[in-house]
Amino acid sequence: MSTIPLSLDFSITPNVVSPAGSAVDANGLMLTDNELIPVGAVQSYYSSSDVSALMGSDSKEFLAAQQYFNGYDNSSVIPGELLMYRLVTADAAGYLLSGNMKGVTLATLKATPAGTIKLVVDGTVVTSTSIDLSAATSFTDIADKVETGIGDTKVSVEWLPIANRFIIRSATTGADSQVSFAYADSGAIATALKLTEATAATVSPGSDAVSMTDTMNNVINTNQNWILFQALTELTDEQKTELCAWASASHNRYGYVVHDTSAAPTVANNASCFVQSVVVANGYENIFPIYGSYLYAVTALAYAASIDFARTNGRISFKFRGFSGLAPNVSDLATAQALKSNGYNFYGSYSLNKTMAQYASDGAITGKFVWLDSFIDQVWINANLVGAYANLFTANQSYPFNANGYGAVQAATIDVAEQAVTFGAIQRGVVLDNAQIRIVNTSVGKDISATLYSQGWYLFIPTQTGSARLARDLQGVIFYWVDGQLIQSITMSSTAIL
């Protein structure tokens, strides 16, 4: 179901001042070309076993889900939901996928009375010839009999042993390709083979090829309860570029975790690697580049989905996180420095003296927020501000353009701000640069540095014009908050006093 974004009425523009509850879940979204993900539907999975039951334990979808649901080592929570969406890079056939046949024996199906199956294929109602399963020798043989009954010029039918399902594909591809649920009055055959909606069958519409941009727009028109996304499919540089452009234009709402398996990032200061030649050259923001296969990209999604926003001091950086089941893919200083010079994150093996550690590095994301945790925090804060204001204005009250109205907005903001302080997204006691203080004070017309130091945040509501009141739009409001950043390295001297 498509919805009107709340940002139509509550528009919050993320911004930063650089040095001289939960209204959104940090779920991960994975793009895949697997046919078993229905076209146009955002599929939710709540465990890796849900994925393997459909796509098998050797599928990249299961391997990614397994890594995702593990979260990061020692996390206080683990991911609760994984989203997947199908990439359609070529015209696709519509299909009908049966309900799960696990536990249904061949003998049971052979005992089903002969009958017909009625469904719609490519817009035309089709009734099969009588299908007799009494002499079937296997589930594959049953698929052949169903295909013959419906007509092999209209459909192809296949038994999927890993998924334990039958799939009936249209013989055509494209937007007009279609196979509907079997009609409820089809009879015993359709019910026994679980081809009806009542028996948990699934339909996927046919589709023309869909661009990366349209794919992502279709996703957010269906589901916005996620922050980071990645592709399990190996995309071309042109397709990756299109996804980078989309993420960069998302107003700091979504981040693209792009993986790179080529050797180019391991050459220091390499202007021809993807990040430098595409991401940096075009100024794309909200891109989290990571060296390695799609499994290494999963670490960013697993990290984000394991953040406990309800925990006191729950904020934690991506750097130093360990991911069980994943081997480090960088173990020498030269490669690590080369990757950093090109803007890539990686999973490293570190050691000095007898101390050894495996952890992710460095957690950098392109754009104004610089670090992945800061990026995720601002998405969470802004989403919760929208949620707070939506609750405020739908609570059967109205708020005028005076101290009472502004106070109500301030009160709604306080709950979000204090939760962010408790979590650690907003930090108190941070000494800002003089340049930062000057920019903020100039914007609000007074010195608020003491408030930012002691409180960590400040809500600025300027005097409203008559035209703003007439439009009923509270304009120019700015929520200042101090991120504070996190310590990720130590440079010091060790001095012996003799």
Segments the model singles out, each with a brief description of its role:
Residues M1-A26, D33-I37, V42-L295, N434-I439:
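Polar low-complexity, Ser/Thr/Gly/Ala/Asp/Asn-rich disordered segments used for subunit assembly
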Residues M1-F62, N70-P79, A360-L498:
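Structured, hydrophobic secondary-structure cores that serve as assembly/anchoring elements
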Residues D73, T148, I220-S398, R428-G429, ...:
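A glycine- and small-residue-enriched flexible loop/hinge signal that marks low-structured segments
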Residues I117, Y350-L352, F479-D483:
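Short beta-strand elements
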Residues G149, A171, L232, A357, ...:
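Generic structural signal for bulky hydrophobic/aromatic residues embedded
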Residues T153, K194, G343, G424-A425:
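Short glycine-centered helix-capping/turn motifs at secondary-structure transition points
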Residues K154-E158, G343, Y347, I478:
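Short, surface-exposed charged micro-motifs
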